[in-house]
């Protein structure tokens, strides 16, 4: 029933994708709602810090300025069927875009296999 080491095999022709979206923290609820509207039922959220062209910012604490190199962001991880990819990316783009530096990034990659630990389900049924 469950695959053993070395027995992993592709699911029955299902193409799975992974979206990693880095967005502004205050937009999390809006992005989450937009993804749910297009049929995404599960996601993993992680608080992350980083910088790109935005290059951090300056904060003042007790009269002293500090350079903050890493900017707080939220990483949203979603594994989904290839058929939902375009709608999910579009939902993130429309919801997370402010037009200013620091809007974030979206990374899309292929997923070889997905398995639900509890049941052993594979592929799209495991998501």
Task: Give the residues covered by each predicted segment.
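Positively charged, small/polar-rich N-terminal and surface patches that mediate targeting and assembly
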Residues: 1-127
């Amino acid at each position: 029933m469950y695959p053993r080491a070395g027995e992993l095999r592709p699911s029955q022709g299902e193409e799975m994708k992974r979206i990693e979206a880095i967005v502004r923290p205050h937009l999390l609820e809006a992005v989450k709602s937009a993804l749910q509207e297009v049929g995404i039922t599960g996601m993993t959220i992680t608080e992350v810090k980083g910088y790109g062209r935005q290059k951090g910012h300056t904060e003042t604490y007790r009269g002293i300025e500090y350079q903050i190199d890493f900017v707080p962001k939220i990483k949203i991880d979603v594994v989904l069927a290839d058929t939902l990819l375009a709608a999910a990316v579009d939902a993130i783009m429309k919801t997370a875009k402010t037009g200013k530096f620091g809007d974030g990034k979206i990374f899309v990659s292929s997923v070889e296999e997905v398995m639900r630990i509890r049941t052993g389900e594979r592929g799209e049924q495991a998501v």
